[in-house]
């Protein structure tokens, strides 16, 4: 019996010594000093870092926002080139390019709804987006691509609508009308567009004043009219753009029919410093 007590006391003493050694070494009792715990900690650390690494990869794969793929031959006649070719309000497009994957029409005025230009840029499988109020007019034009009628490719929209046009391209329609003049009445149902292409958001305002409901527009690149008379002025346009805060602002609708080249200067000077103005209208004077 005394032998059992002595052995128990000895065992307890050995266990206490082992615990003290373990505390001193910072290593749990019973773990061998063979580097295995350290390897496990390193592995756990690497696993914890993986989500951060994945986030960096996502950022690298995100579409780069720039304006190199944009041309504007005149007025508000915009062409965006990428995996898909997009035209907005094509006007005075004299070359029979027949390369448009998507054509967007903001309203019915001749410098935005130009039949010869539409027929020059359309191809057999083009999709045309227009205000719902213009659907009959667009259909009546009987726009053809190289070989056939493309009426089946017409999508009509009202402000507030969103349409997925194809993989990688979504279009949102936003209001476009005048507040203090009657050139573009709200009742006409004309619109501007936000075109989302592989994550990059292009805002084409159409002919509009600086409407309160446009202050919530989210975009990377904004095309806004600056010529005044029929639309907002350069100063008003800058005020709107400073609220929606795109990376780039491109003035349109000036320098030919209405407005002067100097309107772009006024617009650019009034922009916040973190917004870059880019001139694209080729014939502005």
Question: Predicted regions span which residues?
Answer:
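Bacterial N-terminal signal peptides that target proteins for export
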Residues: 2-12
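C-terminal motif of bacterial Sec signal peptides marking the signal peptidase cleavage site
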Residues: 19-22
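Active-site metal-binding motif and surrounding structural segment of the metallo-beta-lactamase
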Residues: 91-137, 218-223
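Active-site environment of divalent metal-dependent phosphoester hydrolases
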Residues: 94-95, 109-113, 135-138, 161-164, ...
């Amino acid at each position: 019996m005394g032998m059992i007590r002595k052995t128990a006391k000895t065992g307890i003493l050995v266990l206490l010594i082992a615990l003290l050694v373990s505390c001193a070494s910072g290593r749990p009792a019973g773990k061998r000093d063979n580097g295995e715990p350290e390897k496990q900690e390193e592995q756990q650390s690497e696993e914890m870092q993986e989500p951060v690494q994945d986030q960096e990869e996502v950022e690298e794969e995100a579409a780069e926002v720039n304006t190199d793929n944009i041309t504007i031959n005149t007025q508000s006649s915009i062409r965006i080139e990428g995996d898909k070719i997009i035209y907005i309000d094509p006007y005075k497009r004299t070359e029979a390019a027949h390369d448009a994957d998507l054509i967007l029409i903001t309203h019915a005025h001749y410098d935005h709804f130009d039949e010869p230009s539409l027929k020059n840029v359309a191809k057999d499988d083009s999709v045309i987006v227009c205000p719902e109020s213009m659907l009959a007019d667009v259909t009546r034009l009987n726009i053809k691509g190289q070989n056939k009628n493309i009426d089946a490719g017409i999508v009509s929209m009202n402000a507030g609508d969103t349409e997925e046009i194809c993989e990688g391209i979504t279009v949102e329609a936003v209001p476009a009308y005048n507040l203090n003049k009657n050139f573009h009445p709200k009742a006409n149902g004309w619109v501007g567009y936000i075109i989302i292409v592989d994550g990059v958001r292009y805002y084409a305002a159409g002919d509009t004043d600086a409407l309160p409901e446009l202050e919530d527009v989210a975009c990377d690149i904004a095309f806004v009219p600056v010529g005044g008379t029929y639309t907002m002025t350069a100063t008003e346009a800058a005020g709107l753009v400073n609220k929606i805060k795109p990376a780039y602002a491109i003035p349109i609708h000036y320098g030919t029919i209405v407005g002067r080249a100097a309107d772009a200067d006024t617009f650019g000077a009034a922009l916040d410093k973190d917004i870059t103005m880019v001139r694209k209208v080729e014939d502005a004077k």
